[in-house]
Amino acid sequence: PPKCVNSLHFHNTAEVFFVLSGKWRFFWGLNGDAGEVILQEGDIFNIPTRVFRGFENVGTDYGMIMAILGGDDSGGGVIWAPHVLETAQSHGLVLSESGILYNTKKGQVLPAGEQPMAKLSEAQLAAIPETPVSKVVPDYVARYWDMMALARNRPCPVIGEASLIKDKPGFEVEL
């Protein structure tokens, strides 16, 4: 729905977003202020690995995005920003080390031997890049109408070693 927000997190594998409908703002950085881009239907975003990212529906109607995690570990593991862990806990939500979310307000408890995900240390946080817009947008975003123009006579390679988005997320995309 409009104003639906996904909190800042990162994965250890690639995460590629396909905007199926609506208007979406993707933002990144520890506090979500390192950069942002607005994407619309048909656009593709291969957000860099190990970069905190979030997104929200900024359209006036329901929207849908599809996310694909790449590599050999399609679960990708999820790491929440420290302030996201704190906010979640204030609402009774606990993310376990294994990436499972428990709602303590609904009586859910972590199983024996399972621990809550620890906050990243200052040293760990300092090692996570605050990638600038000038790097992210040209290198990791493919706009629908650009892809359509390039696909007029043959398939347009979108994600791959010799594509618009030069990356190896564990799969390739052509339009």
Where are these regions (language model features)?
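Double-stranded beta-helix
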Residues: F52-P132
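A generic "binding-loop/recognition-motif" signal
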Residues: P2-C4, N12-T13, V51-F52, D61
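Short acidic-glycine-tyrosine-enriched beta hairpin
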Residues: L30-T49
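Short histidine-centered beta-strand/loop micro-motifs
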Residues: N6-H11, W28, E36-I38, E56-N57
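Histidine-centered metal-chelating micro-motifs
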Residues: C4-S7, R25, D43-F45, T49-F55
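A short, N-terminal "cap"/entry segment at the start of jelly-roll beta-barrel domains
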Residues: P1, S96-L175
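Short, conserved beta-strand element in jelly-roll/cupin
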Residues: F10-L30, I68-D72, L175
